[in-house]
Amino acid sequence: LLPGEGQLDNRQLLEALHQSLLGQGVQVHWHSSRTLEDFRPGEPGQPDGLIDCRGLGARAQCEGLRGVRGEVVRLHAPEVSLARPTRLIHPRYPIYIAPKQDHVFVIGATEIETDDLSPPSVRSTLELLSAAYTVHPGFAEARILEIATQARPTLRDNLPALRVRGRNTLQINGLYRHGFLIAPALMDAALDWVLHRSRAQADAWGLHIMDDVA
């Protein structure tokens, strides 16, 4: 790793964040479909502000937003002892082998210009598994725990965007395939704007906060 760099297990992080929210008395409502029209920030009985992080669910209010399909494979490989994320050079897209706890590895991800959420294709599965096997023969006897498909919310320039809608609504979208890497910088920029109406953090990270973009 580079100096000061680290790695994390994304699922463990999400669970830790969830428990932290619950510990602070935050009510979390899963699978509750909402639109911006369901809220009137600042009015009596309504939240003071609204942060819209719906990804592709915000397509109607986020011009240029599209889905980019990604597939990943989760394996249990007791014979493999990789301890650091490994990037493979692939002709179609970047592929990573990400080690998790107890010899679990995530291999991914494909990058296909479609928001199709059908099950993973044979081609993609073969590419990911073959890539893993070329790195370590121990993957030949690995057990497939999961093959998952999802679509990444992506803007035209493949960069994230913060958009101010009205006085009390902030949209954050377009994190593409860099969510866990760039999220801390976006959080700093968003908090700076929400708490202080300042763009200093956004400017420091090279992010642009756009005003009143429909």
Predicted regions and their residues:
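C-terminal catalytic lobe of FAD-dependent flavoproteins
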Residues: 142-214
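Helical element adjacent to the flavin cofactor pocket in flavoenzyme catalytic cores
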Residues: 2-49, 53
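A short local loop/turn or secondary-structure capping micro-motif enriched for an aromatic residue
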Residues: 38, 114-117, 179-181
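Active-site substrate-recognition segment that forms the wall
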Residues: 54-166
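Short, hydrophobic alpha-helical segments
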Residues: 21-28, 136, 190-198
